[in-house]
């Protein structure tokens, strides 16, 4: 995520702000229907004359791929060894606490109601990025799992949160705000869940971002169609639990698909409210550009639908480095140490995938 024209924090990694892909070949696995779709896009530059012949070639490629995949699954069993991971941050603990206090000053002055401040953790890359992704699928399964290999860097993610979705003419945003760690026992887990739902600070923060989500959905929905279908429910993941709500609206077709995406970008749950002033404060207080973190990852489909998630619980592997960024929502009564600990807890799932 980048604020146009702002250069207060440094760009320390050569990673693009945007990367768009238009693949020729797609393999779509529908896990609910237990079906696999193999799609081969044909473009004019290929100058194909016999499409039936091309179809048979593609089918042969698919069967060959299936055979190779089966062989790899049988012969490529590796033993995972536990490793001690040394982690450092781009922000010292004391500086992060100061960042929180400075944000609270801005809130007191009336500049903002809330802002999400983050820190970026860095560790040595101890295994292949694709192996980290495979481990995440087991240890931290999430609604959005993704792996992108751009040769000079890789993006690995297990995001819990929709950015904006258009499906069946319905716009969906699903704000997540409010966090507790998972308990070590069932009773401790229940304690944290109850504590989260009784925390006035967390509830007020979530309500604020839920209202922001309703406003975002309303920008590209038909009048009086926006509604909250889930409100203040708890979703649990491997290391943390969250308060989650769900907002839908009937898509107004006078808006383009791209405009619909921008209606919710960047998400208030990773920036703050009001968004623009919150982003200015983020740029002032954070030490390095966020880049992938808090941005959007997803697809636009040929059928006119799209689905995107927020780049949370997302790591970047570059050369021999592994980067994970995590944030916490700051409001008027935030406790700096508690917000610091929240960022650490959110980053644990990805850091532990290195072990």
Placement of each model-derived feature along the sequence:
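Extended alpha-helical targeting/anchoring segments
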Residues: 6-7, 11-355
């Amino acid at each position: 995520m980048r604020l146009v024209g702002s250069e207060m924090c440094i760009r320390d990694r050569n990673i693009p702000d945007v990367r768009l892909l238009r693949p020729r070949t797609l393999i779509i696995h529908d896990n609910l229907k237990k079906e696999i779709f193999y799609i081969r896009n044909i473009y004019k530059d290929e100058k194909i004359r016999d499409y039936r012949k091309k179809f048979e070639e593609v089918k042969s490629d698919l069967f060959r791929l299936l055979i190779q995949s089966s062989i790899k699954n049988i012969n490529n069993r590796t033993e995972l060894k536990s490793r001690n991971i040394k982690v450092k941050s781009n922000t010292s603990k004391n500086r992060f606490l100061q960042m929180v206090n400075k944000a609270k000053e801005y809130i007191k002055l009336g500049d903002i109601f809330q802002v999400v401040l983050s820190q970026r953790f860095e560790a040595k890359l101890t295994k292949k990025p694709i192996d980290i992704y495979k481990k995440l699928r087991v240890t931290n399964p999430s609604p959005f799992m993704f792996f992108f290999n751009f040769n000079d860097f890789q993006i690995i993610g297990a995001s819990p949160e929709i950015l904006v979705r258009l499906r069946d003419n319905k716009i969906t945003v699903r704000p997540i705000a409010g966090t507790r760690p998972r308990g070590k026992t069932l009773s401790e887990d229940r304690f944290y869940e109850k504590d989260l739902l009784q925390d006035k600070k967390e509830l007020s923060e979530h309500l604020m971002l839920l209202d922001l989500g309703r406003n975002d959905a309303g920008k590209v929905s038909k009048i009086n169609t926006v509604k909250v279908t889930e409100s203040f429910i708890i979703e649990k993941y491997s290391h943390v639990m969250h308060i989650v709500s769900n907002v839908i609206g009937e898509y107004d077709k006078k808006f383009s698909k791209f405009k619909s995406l921008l209606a919710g970008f960047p998400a208030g749950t990773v920036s703050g409210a009001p968004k623009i002033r919150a982003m200015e404060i983020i740029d002032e207080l954070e030490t390095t550009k966020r880049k992938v973190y808090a941005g959007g990852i997803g697809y636009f489909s040929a059928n006119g639908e799209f689905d995107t998630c927020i780049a949370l619980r997302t790591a970047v592997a570059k050369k021999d480095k592994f980067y994970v960024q995590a944030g916490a929502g700051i409001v008027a009564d935030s406790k700096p140490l508690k917000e610091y600990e929240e960022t650490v807890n959110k980053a644990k799932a990805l850091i532990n995938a290195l072990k």
